[in-house]
Amino acid sequence: MFRTILRMTQTELFDYLVDILKEKDYNVIVGKNNILNEREYIAAKGNIPIVLLAHLDTVFPDETRKNMSIYHDSEQGVIWSPNGLGADDRAGVYMILQILESTDLRPHILFTTNEESTGIGAEAVSSKKEELFGKVSYVIELDRQGYKECVFYDCDNTQFQKLIESYGFKTEQGTFTDISIICPSWGVAGVNLSVGYLWEHSYVEHFYSAMWYDTYRKVLQMLNDKDAYSKTWKYIPKELKIDLMKKYNKDIKKEFLGK
């Protein structure tokens, strides 16, 4: 399945995912920009109030997808392509599909378009939490490079951070992904988790199945943790700490004014 997903254009993958979700008896909502005539997201409400999120586009041109060469070292569990693999973020899409195929769990599902360029899919759902899902405990985006990493961006909910770290992740810093738009708008905490790719956005991008599987197991644990998802984890924006500002101002005065 993973190779099939890697070879699809964003449009082909969009259609494929709509069909899969319908087969799983989800009520599927397709978000569309009628002015631009572009489809922006796929949303499917489940009975577990955790949103699993991945984006459908890659940085590589769609026309290179169909005939791309894919190499697999089965002993090392590594996949790569000289055409640009696109595991960012097809690895996240694949994880969501495997959860649906291999378990009876029914989390909320959200797939967005054009994260790598405009973030238009995330923008389109930023005001639609109640309409699409109702209650949301928190959001898991599956779009981070590497292994065992979790990123919270500008969400400063320390209790939520401790919860995610308790599953075996280590907090790192990041710049942008869809939850950077969605979570502040929804007022709900979110995290981006590693899904096993390295050297993304380059022609030497590699995908490591063991790294991916480690996160897969942890996400299953999170989806089964009813005590955790029974509450809503609030989005708390980061603020510049007042005590740090005071220290900064004091240091400036001392250096320039001798005070």
Predicted regions: what they are:
Residues C150-W186, F256-K259:
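An extended, acidic, His-containing surface patch that forms the Zn2+-binding/catalytic region
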Residues R3-I48:
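A non-catalytic alpha/beta surface segment that caps or lines the substrate-entry region
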Residues K170-T215:
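Zn-dependent metallopeptidase/amidohydrolase metal-coordination segment
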Residues V30, A44-R106:
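Active-site metal-coordination/substrate-binding segment of hydrolases
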Residues W199-K259:
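His/Asp/Glu-rich mid-to-C-terminal helical/loop segments that flank catalytic regions of hydrolases
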Residues E23-N33, I70-D73, Y167-T171:
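Short secondary-structure junctions
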